[in-house]
Structure formats: C-alpha cells, structure tokens
Amino acid sequence: MRVAVVGATGMVGEIMLQVLAERNFPVTELIPVASEKSVGKEIEWKGNTYKVVGLQTAVDMKPEIALFSAGGETSLEWAPKFAAVGTTVIDNSSAWRMDATKKLVVPEINASVLTKEDKIIANPNCSTIQMVMALAPLHAKYDIKRIVISTYQSITGTGVKAVRQLENEYAGIQDEMAYKYPIHRNAIPQCDSFEENGYTKEEMKLVRETQKILNDNTIAVTATAIRIPVVGGHSEAVNVQFENDFDVNEVRQILSNTPGVTVQDNLETYSYPMPIYAQGKDDVFVGRIRRDESQPNTINMWIVADNLRKGAATNTIQIAEYLVANNLV
C-alpha cells in the first residue's frame, strides 16, 4: 500500500513514521512529504532511504492513504486534492474536525461510523482523545451530564520550537521563543489563541470535539488549558457529573477492561499516572479515581497520555488500520 506522510519532517510526522514501523503497517511504498524547503532531504525508514517530495508530486503519485500533520492551512488546500485522486486522507489538524460532513474518529470509540465514501477523516485534538478514551465507556454506563476539565499540557504540543525554548531557558541561553513568556519554571494559562468568549481555541476543542465524538450535544463541558514545562505528555484533572449514581470500584473495573486504557490507581504504592511514565507509550493512563464528595453522582480522575502518540500519530495510524482491516480503502 502506498502511504504518504505529509509533514514527515515535523515532530508528529517523525512519530508517525516510527509508529508505522512499530505496528508493521502494510506499506509497500512510503512517500515522505514536506514543504518546499525540505524537498530533496533524505529520511531513513526501516533500513531504506527515501527522498522527501513536495505536495503536488505526492498527489500525482496517487497514494492509497495520506497521513497529514502539516497544519490547518495545508490541510484545507491539499486534502481535497488528494481526495480527488482517490486517496483517503487522515488529518491531524483542526481544519476538518467540526465539518458536519467529516467524521471525527477515535477508533476504540466510534470507528464504526467510517465508510468507503469518507475520503477526508479528522483526527481529534490530543487532549480530547485521551479524555474521551476514559470517559466514553463511563458515558455508556452512567450517562455523563457535565465535565469540568483542567489540562496541563506538554510543550511538545506546540512543536520543536517550544522544546528548543525550554532547553535554552534551562541552559540559560537567550534565543527565539515559541511563547510570549518563559516556560521554564512557569505555567502559561493559554494554549492557542483566544476566542470571543474568553476561552482559548484549545479549550473549545475539548467542548466541541467531545460532544461530536460521543455523539451527544447535551453534555456540558467547560475547560481550562495550561501549558507547563513538561515533554512527556498531557495531564488532565477531570471532574465528571453523571445522570446516574455509580460505584467507584465498578468505575475502576470498567476502565481496566477498556482497550487502550491502563488504570494506575494504588495509593498505598503511590501509583498514579505521570507524563514521565506515559512518554513513548500508546495507552491512556487513568488514576486518582475518587468520588467528588461535594456533589452527587460526580467523580474525579487524573488522565495522562503521550500527546504525540495516542494524542496524534498512533490514533491516526489506528484509523488507517481500521480502514485496511475493513476494506474501506
């Protein structure tokens, strides 16, 4: 199968290539794609050397699948061009997520909505993916009424420039900054730009995407997204109010039985999720599970995942695997 990776030289693109190899995705021809400044560069993949090509060249090669991680503007312009030649596009940007004609997919939750006609498929936001992975099975059992979420997000979600800023600040070097403020020894209560309602785009993604993935616009969601000087993954403090009461041990059991979710919740051994543990792994880790004693039918939990893997690259490739396994591509 001919597979194009659009944004192959970027942070998520590199992880996509890594995950494709790890999961032995059936690639017969790899097409690494990037901006014009990277065309001609060579990358190594599974013992072979490939030259990076431009977008039009990749379209002309008519790959069966194109995995996009090149930003919204690139996706809006080029995803339809790939789709027009028969390529199925799986896009990591926010460009198509809230388009009513496009599917927003977390395979463990709603892959069954996909059909052969879906030529542009949206990958959800990283912070949304890890939250709904934990909440979807609980929604099915107890019916979620309201979610209050605060995120503590890795600088890797911003990209290479942000990682470089942290490394430079740690070393005492003044250089180009990805953020308006220092990130070393700091917490910045802004992820992405602000909308008119005072929330950031990142916060509103959590609201809108959660409702779309769970197929329930009655769920109330409010979010605060914070950038912290961590590289291993995103962490989330999540407070969930259900319509129905629950048993905490049953919640743990449901989560333990959910594919792609690992429960780390042993207070005696100080076992709970942390980015340093989640980094490089594909599971979503859930812990600090406890009843909210201030409000009926409400639970607190702490959710952590590697935002570059399950939050981006791995989820994208899992969608591609589903398409292949079900002859949808």
Task: Write out the residue ranges for each language-model feature.
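Charged docking surfaces used in two-component/phosphorelay signaling
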Residues: 66, 155-329
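N-terminal Rossmann-like NAD(P) cofactor-binding subdomain of oxidoreductases
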Residues: 1-183, 218-220, 284-285, 289-295, ...
